[in-house]
A protein has these predicted regions:
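Extended substrate-binding grooves/exosites of carbohydrate-active enzymes
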Residues: 22-63, 116-119, 124-126, 180, ...
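Surface beta-strand/loop "capping" patches
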Residues: 242-272, 621-658, 745-761
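Acidic-aromatic substrate-binding/catalytic surfaces of carbohydrate-active enzymes
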Residues: 76-129, 720, 724-729, 762-848
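Extended acidic/polar, glycine-enriched regions
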Residues: 201-204, 268-351, 704-749
Length: 849
C-alpha cells in the first residue's frame, strides 16, 4: 500500500510540473493528496450509552475529547516548531526518523504562529499580502512552519483503521507519519482526514507537519480579516472499525400543513459486516419514539435508507429550537457493539415561494449579523465558551441569524446554533477580492480554478448538510462572477434541493435563489419591490457597524416591515477584530492594522474594527440601537386620552404569553406612576389594543414621558428571567396626549406685542420680556435677551459640520463634503429684511455659503 501511494504522489508531482513549479502549493489543480473524501461530521463512540452520555453533557463540556468513551485522542498541546523565511530555508529532512528537534522552539497547537512570536499577522481588506500572479506565490518570503510531535496509539485500537484529523490549517500543509508522507491538503477552514494506518508502529510514533503561509489556495482566502498561518483548529487521532458508517444524510422536513415530521435518512456503509446490524433510533428528551434495525445480508449492502412520518411533532425554528436526537449504532454478527454516534436535529422546512424564503411556511425576518471567528488574544483560534457568549449576546439583543463570514466555521458553532436557535447562512471559503485589481478581474471564469471552487463548496455542504440551523448555502464572497459559480449552484441544488443557494457577486444576473446585495441604499430596497423580481431581497451585508454607526437602521426596517419580499439582512459585523496588547509604554490598547509588528506591509488600519461588540465582547453603544430596531414587540400610540396602545407581535412563530409589560410615567428621571400587566393572547404577526391605567398628568410645566418595557417572565436558555426584550418611550402633555409635533413659539413665552427697530447696524425685535438683535453687516444674531439676561455670548453662526465618524473617514467624506466644514464662518450676507406677516414680525436673513 505504501508503494502504491508513493506512485500516486510521483504522478501528481509530474502533473504539477506543467505549472513551472513541481509543487502542489502553486497548482490549483492539486488541492489534496491522500485526503479522505468529505463526509458529514459525526463523532463515533464505543457504544450507544457512551454516545448518549456525552450528548447529555452541558454545552461547554460536550465537545471535549473523552478517551474513556470514544476512540479519539487529542493531539492539541505543545509541539516542537521551527520557523523558516521560505521553503528553501526549511530543513528538507525534518520529517525523517531520528531528526533532532531539541533546539527547536515550543508552540501551542491549535494557534496561529504569528500570535506566538513567529512573524506577524497582516490585516488587509481587499489587497493580497503579496503581488497577485495566480497561481504563484512568493518564494523569497513565504514563511514555512515545521511542526513535530510524538504520539502513542492505544493497544486496543489494534485491527482498526486509524485516522489523523486536522480541523483547520492555514494555508496548505504536508504531513508525515514515521517518515512516510501521509498526505497534503488545502482549504484552511475545513477538516482534512488521512488514513494513517499503514504508517503506524507500536510505541511512539512521529508526526511531522509542514505548513506554508501562502499557497495557490491563498488566492481564494482573501477575506476582510487578518492573514495568519499555522495549525489553527484542533488535531485528533481517531480509530474506527473497518465495518462502519462512512457517511449519512438526514433530511427532516415538515408536511401536512407543517404539523407532521417527514424523516428521511440515508446511510452509507464501509465494508459491511455480513450478519451485522445497523440500528437507528430517534429520541425525544431521552425517550425512544422510533426504532428500526436492519441486518446486513450481503458484503455489497452498503446503503441503508429509512423513511418515517412522525405525527404532531414540535418543529424547529430560531424561536423554539426543538431538537430530537438521532442515534445510529452498528453491531457485528454476534451482537457486539461496534460503534454509535448521535446527531441532534430538528424538523424544519425551507421553501422559496411567492418571492419569499419561508421557514416552516412563514416568511421569517432575518435580524442578522456577520460573524468572524475572533479572539482578542488567539485570533482565529476560539473556544466553545466564547461561542456560547456570542450566542447569548445575540439572543439578548434580538438577533436571530448569522452569516458565517466568509468561510465554514468550527463544527461546534453549528451544534450550538442548532441547540439555542439561530438561523445560519453557511458560506464557502471562496473570496478573491484582491483579483479586482488584476487584469483578469476574477478567477471564476478561469478553467484552471474550477477544481478548488468545486471542492471548497462541495466539501462544506457534505460536512454541514445535517445541521438544522443552516437555512441557506452561500457560494462565497466578493469574488466577481463567472461560470464556476453557476457550476457550484447547479451541483448544490441537485445535491441538496431542500435549501436555497445564494451569492451576491452577480447582482440580479447571478444564479442565486436570493437577491443578496451588500450595502444597498434604502431606496434600492424600494426599487426591488417595485420591479417585481421573483426573489426575496436579504442584504448579505449592511449597516456597517464601525464606530458611531447604524444610525439609519430604522429606515431600512420601516421598509422591511412593510413589504413581504424584504426579509432583513446581516449587519457588518459582530465583533471587532482587534487584539488586547500593550503598547511600548505599557498602556493597554486595542491593536489593529499595522499595530501587530509587520513594518512596511500595507494594511487597512482600523477597518477591522466594525463590531457591535469589542473583541472581548464588551458592548459598543450602537448595539443598543440594533436591539431597539430588531425588537419583536412594537408599540404604537392610538389615543392617549383613552390611554390606548397598539401592540404588534413581530415574532415569526410564538405568542407573547412568556412576556410581561411594565409601564412607567417619568419626569425629571423619576417614576411618578407605574404598573405591570400581562399581554393579551396574541399569535405571531398579530396586533391587539391595550389600555394603560395611568392618571392624567398635572399641568406644572414639567416634561412627562410614558415608558413601555417588555420583560421575560421566566428564564430561558441564555436569557434570564426579567430580561428586557423591547421598549418604547413617548413624551406626554398635560392632557395626556403624546406630543406628536413638540414645538414652541415666541407667543408661548412673550407678550403678543412686538416692537421693531432698524438702525444702520442692527435690526431689533423687542417684547415685554425679550429682545432679539440681528447685525445688518453679516446677518448674525448678536443678542438674545430674555427676562433681562442675555442668553448668547456672541453672534450665532450656522454649523453644517460634526465630528467625523469612522464610516465617514472610510468613505472619503472629508474629500466629498469638506467644503461645508467652515461654510458657516465664510458666510456672506445677501439680504436682511423685516416685515409683518399675519400679525407676526418676521426677520428674514438670506446668506450665501
Amino acid at each position: 500500500m505504501k508503494h502504491s501511494l508513493h506512485t500516486v504522489l510521483t504522478l501528481l508531482f509530474v502533473c504539477a510540473s506543467a505549472w513551472g513549479e513541481n509543487v502542489p502549493w502553486q497548482n490549483p489543480q492539486i488541492n489534496e493528496i491522500n485526503r479522505e473524501p468529505a463526509h458529514a461530521h459525526f463523532i463515533p463512540y464505543t457504544n450507544e450509552a457512551n454516545a448518549l452520555k456525552q450528548q447529555a453533557l452541558p454545552a461547554a463540556q460536550r465537545f471535549a475529547v473523552n478517551p474513556a468513551t470514544e476512540r479519539r485522542i487529542s493531539l492539541d498541546g505543545t509541539w516542537k516548531f521551527l520557523f523558516s523565511k521560505n521553503n528553501e530555508e526549511c530543513p528538507t529532512d525534518f520529517y525523517k526518523m531520528g531528526y533532532n528537534t531539541k533546539r527547536w522552539k515550543d508552540i501551542q497547537v491549535p494557534g496561529s504562529w504569528e500570535l506566538q512570536g513567529f512573524d506577524s499577522p497582516i490585516y488587509t481588506d481587499v489587497a493580497y499580502p503579496f503581488p497577485a500572479n495566480p497561481p504563484h506565490v512568493p518564494t523569497d518570503y513565504n514563511p514555512v512552519g515545521a511542526y513535530v510531535r510524538e504520539f502513542t496509539v492505544p493497544a486496543h485500537w489494534k485491527g482498526m483503521d486509524i485516522f489523523l484529523d486536522f480541523e483547520g490549517v492555514e494555508s496548505a500543509f504536508y504531513c508525515w507519519v514515521n517518515g512516510e508522507l501521509a498526505g497534503y491538503s488545502e482549504d484552511s477552514r475545513l477538516p482534512a482526514h488521512f488514513n494513517i494506518t499503514p504508517f503506524l508502529k507500536a510505541g511512539k510514533n512521529k508526526l511531522a507537519v509542514k505548513v506554508f503561509r501562502y499557497s495557490d489556495g491563498s488566492y481564494l482566502e482573501d477575506q476582510d480579516y487578518w492573514k495568519y498561518s499555522g495549525i489553527e483548529r484542533d488535531v485528533y487521532l481517531y480509530a474506527r472499525p473497518q465495518s462502519r458508517v462512512q457517511d449519512f444524510k438526514l433530511v427532516a422536513g415538515l408536511t401536512n400543513g407543517y404539523k407532521d415530521g417527514d424523516f428521511n435518512l440515508d446511510i452509507t456503509l464501509h465494508k459491511p459486516h455480513l450478519g451485522g446490524i445497523v440500528e437507528v433510533k430517534v429520541m425525544d428528551k431521552g425517550n425512544v419514539i422510533y426504532q428500526h434495525k436492519k441486518e446486513i445480508t450481503s458484503a455489497t449492502d452498503t446503503l441503508f435508507a429509512q423513511k418515517h412520518l412522525f405525527p404532531a411533532i414540535l418543529p424547529w425554528n430560531a424561536e423554539t429550537p426543538n431538537l430530537y436526537t438521532l442515534v445510529v449504532s452498528t453491531y457485528d454478527a454476534q451482537g457486539k457493539a461496534l460503534e454509535s454516534f448521535t446527531q441532534p436535529f430538528g424538523f424544519r422546512s425551507v421553501e422559496m415561494r411567492n418571492g419569499m424564503q419561508l421557514i416552516n411556511g412563514v416568511a421569517v425576518l432575518f435580524k442578522g449579523v456577520n460573524r468572524h471567528e475572533h479572539d482578542p488574544h488567539h485570533g482565529r483560534t476560539i473556544t466553545v465558551e466564547s461561542m456560547i457568549k456570542d450566542i447569548q449576546l445575540m439572543k439578548q439583543f434580538n438577533l436571530n441569524a448569522v452569516r458565517t463570514c466568509h468561510y465554514p466555521n468550527r463544527y461546534e458553532w453549528y451544534a450550538l446554533c442548532n441547540e439555542y436557535g439561530l438561523y445560519l447562512v453557511d458560506e464557502a471559503n471562496i473570496e478573491s477580492h484582491g483579483m479586482q485589481a488584476h487584469k483578469d478581474g476574477t478567477l471564476a471564469n478561469n478553467p484552471d480554478w474550477e477544481v478548488p471552487f468545486m471542492q471548497r463548496m462541495s466539501r462544506m455542504v457534505l460536512r454541514d448538510r445535517n445541521i438544522t440551523a443552516i437555512v441557506t448555502w452561500s457560494m462565497g464572497n466578493e469574488s466577481g462572477y463567472g461560470k464556476h459559480f453557476e457550476t457550484l449552484y447547479d451541483w448544490t441544488k441537485k445535491f441538496d434541493p431542500t435549501r436555497p443557494v445564494q451569492y451576491e457577486g452577480g447582482g440580479y444576473d447571478a444564479k442565486s435563489d436570493i437577491y443578496c446585495p451588500m450595502y444597498a441604499r434604502v431606496w434600492a430596497l424600494r426599487r426591488h419591490v417595485n420591479q417585481r423580481d421573483a426573489r426575496p431581497m436579504i442584504l448579505c451585508e449592511y449597516a456597517h457597524a464601525m464606530g458611531n454607526s447604524v444610525g439609519n437602521l430604522q429606515d431600512y426596517w420601516d421598509l422591511i416591515y412593510k413589504y413581504d419580499q424584504l426579509q432583513g439582512g446581516f449587519i457588518w459585523d459582530w465583533v471587532d477584530a482587534t487584539f488586547d496588547i500593550k503598547d511600548k509604554n505599557g498602556n493597554k490598547i486595542w491593536a489593529y492594522g499595522g499595530d501587530m509588528g509587520f513594518v512596511g506591509v500595507p494594511n487597512d488600519s482600523n477597518f477591522c474594527a466594525n463590531g457591535l461588540v469589542a473583541a472581548d465582547r464588551s458592548l459598543h453603544p450602537h448595539i443598543w440601537e440594533v436591539k431597539k430596531v430588531y425588537q419583536y414587540i412594537h408599540f404604537d400610540p392610538v389615543a392617549f386620552t383613552t390611554k390606548q396602545i397598539k401592540v404588534t407581535n413581530w415574532h415569526d412563530f410564538i405568542g407573547l404569553e412568556d412576556y410581561k409589560l411594565h409601564w412607567t410615567v417619568e419626569t425629571d428621571g423619576k417614576a411618578v406612576q407605574s404598573g405591570e400587566m400581562d399581554f393579551p393572547v396574541m399569535a405571531a404577526r398579530s396586533s391587539a389594543f391595550i389600555t394603560i391605567p395611568m392618571n392624567l398628568i398635572p399641568n406644572d410645566g414639567k416634561e412627562y414621558f410614558l415608558k413601555l418595557e417588555a420583560f421575560t417572565k421566566k428564564e430561558a436558555p441564555l436569557v434570564p428571567k426579567g430580561h428586557q426584550v423591547a421598549m418604547e418611550q413617548w413624551q406626554l402633555n398635560p392632557e395626556g396626549e403624546r406630543l406628536l409635533n413638540a414645538t414652541w413659539t415666541a407667543r408661548e413665552l412673550v407678550d403678543k406685542t412686538v416692537n421693531t427697530e432698524r438702525t444702520p447696524d442692527a435690526i431689533t425685535l423687542t417684547g415685554e420680556n425679550f429682545r432679539i438683535a440681528f447685525s445688518t453687516a453679516d446677518g448674525e444674531m448678536t443678542e438674545l435677551l430674555y427676562n433681562g439676561k442675555n442668553l448668547i455670548k456672541e453672534g450665532l453662526q450656522p454649523n453644517f459640520w460634526r465630528a467625523l465618524t469612522d464610516n465617514d473617514v472610510a468613505n472619503n467624506h472629508l474629500e466629498r463634503c469638506g467644503i461645508w466644514k467652515f461654510a458657516g464662518k465664510n458666510a456672506k450676507l445677501q439680504s436682511i429684511d423685516l416685515k409683518e406677516d399675519s400679525n407676526k414680525q418676521l426677520a428674514t436673513v438670506t446668506v450665501n455659503y
